[in-house]
């Protein structure tokens, strides 16, 4: 399943941008959420629109009973109030915000902003710190209108 590979590539990207990234629960959740988002955004051009928000649907057939089979989803309506203390679950809060940014700004602009923001993450950002870095990157790259859309995506998840 290419989405599994793209998810793992997301971890490699973050570790290259910020060596040692992922020290705390929040930063590990951000890492998992970004990995899921990266799998999503990389699959968009080749998915034909088929349940793009379902991550690793081919791989997860062997270990999930829900239909459709998804390792995780990037479109769940989760907020910080839904945290469970499990980084893969809680990462879906972060990935949903990134998914909303993608839908608001388009793939190329969203990916550029999200990737650029991560250069300003420390090894252990909180959700709020990473979100603010992403808003700041949106402002610098695409202007105030984009920054407001990015901020709203994080506000909708209770992150900002």
Please tell me what each predicted stretch does.
Residues 9:
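Active-site neighborhood of glycoside hydrolase catalytic domains
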């Amino acid at each position: 399943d290419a989405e599994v590979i793209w998810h793992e590539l997301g971890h490699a990207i973050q570790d290259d941008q910020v060596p040692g990234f992922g020290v705390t629960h929040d930063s590990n959740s951000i890492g998992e959420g970004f990995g899921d988002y990266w799998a999503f955004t990389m699959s968009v051009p080749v998915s034909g629109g088929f349940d793009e928000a379902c991550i690793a649907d081919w791989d997860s057939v062997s270990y999930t009973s829900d239909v459709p089979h998804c390792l995780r989803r990037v479109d769940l309506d989760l907020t910080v109030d839904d945290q469970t203390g499990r980084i893969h679950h809680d990462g879906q809060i972060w990935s949903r915000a990134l998914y909303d940014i993608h839908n608001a700004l388009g793939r190329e602009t969203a990916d550029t902003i999200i990737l650029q923001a991560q250069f300003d993450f420390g090894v252990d950002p909180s959700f709020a710190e990473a979100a603010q870095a992403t808003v700041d990157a949106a402002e610098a790259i695409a202007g105030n209108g984009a920054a407001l859309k990015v901020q709203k995506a994080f506000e909708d998840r209770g992150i900002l």
